[in-house]
């Protein structure tokens, strides 16, 4: 289905909305087609939307765009665990098809296909509590400790920086000294250029790892994961991981509470490996009108614009769930791109409106 791009209400929160005038009324560029997808799923059973979404986030990270495309399935008679099964099957099918049909393109991009072939393995599923324990180094994963791994990675990076700098200096000195044939000069210069690119990445890691360590050690239970936290977690896995059952305060108002422990919302985030972080967000939707009204008030959202959404519960609802997959983030991970803006011809992100 096609969800509207103009909307009178927020889907994810009011702090990152692009507001515009709609014939004298305030309107917003859509953050998600999900709420409309829920309405259609009640009639059709299983639906999906695919369209542009907009977030006014003043972020300059390599993961953020202000305008991007999302695929958003919504399924009636579906709970969080069936939703996670669907997400896993969907991602696996997409990645395996790319590997099968685009091997030459991946080779041109320098993508190590073996890093993608692990998609055939079952995705690890962690509760928020488990993920926090792993992040802070209180729980190991297959004998690996997040803090110790980072500390060792930092030592390895520093040693490699020393080696690369020494080799670059040696090759540059040999070229300057003369006596080399043209082919030898070209070979060494190409090697130097390659090593300088490697050195750039190594020095970035040298700057980042101490920050990741501090963020992991200082992480406060109950907070959402930031980019550095997602990076630390995913360094211990070679496949996307699913983190579910989040503190309800940090999830959207429409997330269903865990009936066995109402402190948690039945949301799930899928974090891609190799530092790419969240590529899918989803969960089971709240079917209780009473809970929804409470959450709308808690999030300080205008009740009047959500009456149509509350009507979906007043006049009969069923368990349902869904997710949103950010297309550009998925492409960035599959192709191992440095920045999500490389995935789209004319990117829109904080500070860029042209061309």
Annotate each predicted stretch with a short phrase.
Residues 59-67, 259-269, 285:
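A glycine-rich, aromatic-flanked flexible loop/lid motif
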Residues 24, 45-47, 68-70, 238-240, ...:
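Active-site lining segments that contact anionic ligands and/or coordinate catalytic metals
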Residues 2-17, 90-272, 299-308, 314-318:
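Metal-assisted phosphate- and nucleotidyl-transfer catalytic regions
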Residues 76-86:
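Catalytic palm subdomain of template-directed nucleic-acid polymerases
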